[in-house]
């Protein structure tokens, strides 16, 4: 006599939702980071002082604007607002790069020393208005483009006594951010920086810097 087989349990076992990629886990509304950069050459799009060198250390806050973290399952582009604090700004101008004062004007000590000897200045600044557009946010390697603008204050007038301590600065650039863990992100990129007093001084030659930067960020 055949043994009866108990009916199979047809109740469906709920499946656990697939886990998000690490890159999406790292995507957060708020992110804090630190970065540093240095120039490898000067440009001449706007600024006129050549062979100047610029270095900086920055602290950055990121605020995700579009879309929210819950709506990025497809890995589409995101728009982020950034704020930078620069506790360290370094600027070096070599000799014979700032045009001397007109022959009819007697140069002051600060003007002549910069023209003959160059100058090194130290300062700090803030970049309260920045935007970054990042793509492929579901991947570990994510390209981005961005820009920011702000103010800087130096230990002496830039580029000499005819300039100003307070200067405007803005930069645009591109790079990649690499998601190392769900909490840690590495960034590397290039930025074109411009620094000038906005025609508030007696002279305003301006400085353009091609800058490479490296940083880390922590998701909150």
Predicted ranges, named:
Residues 30-34, 77-85, 143-149, 168-170, ...:
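Transmembrane beta-strands of outer-membrane beta-barrel proteins
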Residues 206-220:
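Outer-membrane beta-barrel "beta-signal"
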Residues 34, 38, 57-63, 126-135, ...:
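Residues on the lipid-exposed face of transmembrane beta-strands in outer-membrane beta-barrel proteins
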Residues 36-42, 63, 85-91, 149-157, ...:
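Transmembrane beta-strands of outer-membrane beta-barrel pores
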Residues 46-48, 91-119, 156-162, 200-203:
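Flexible, solvent-exposed loop segments that connect beta-strands
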Residues 20-29, 65-79, 136-143, 180-184:
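Short loop/turn motifs that connect adjacent beta-strands in outer-membrane beta-barrel proteins
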Residues 1-24:
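Cleavable N-terminal export/targeting peptides
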């Amino acid at each position: 006599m055949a043994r009866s087989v108990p009916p199979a349990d047809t109740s469906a076992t709920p499946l656990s939702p697939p886990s998000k990629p690490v890159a999406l886990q790292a995507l957060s509304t708020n992110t804090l980071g630190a970065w540093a950069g240095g120039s490898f050459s000067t440009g001449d799009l706007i600024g006129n002082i050549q062979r100047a060198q610029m270095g900086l250390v920055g602290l950055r806050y990121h605020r995700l604007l579009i879309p929210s973290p819950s709506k990025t399952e497809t890995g589409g582009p995101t728009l982020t607002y950034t704020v930078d604090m620069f506790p360290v700004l370094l600027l070096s101008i070599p000799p014979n790069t700032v045009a001397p004062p007109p022959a009819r004007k007697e140069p002051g000590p600060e003007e002549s020393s910069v023209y003959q000897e160059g100058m090194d200045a130290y300062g700090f600044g803030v970049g309260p208005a920045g935007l970054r557009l990042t793509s492929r946010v579901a991947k570990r390697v994510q390209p981005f483009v961005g820009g920011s603008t702000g103010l800087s204050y130096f230990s002496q007038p830039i580029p000499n006594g005819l300039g100003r301590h307070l200067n405007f600065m803005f930069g645009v650039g591109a790079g990649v951010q690499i998601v190392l863990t769900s909490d840690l992100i590495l960034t590397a990129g290039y930025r074109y920086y411009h620094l000038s007093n906005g025609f508030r001084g007696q002279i305003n030659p301006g400085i353009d810097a091609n800058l490479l930067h490296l940083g880390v960020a922590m998701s909150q």
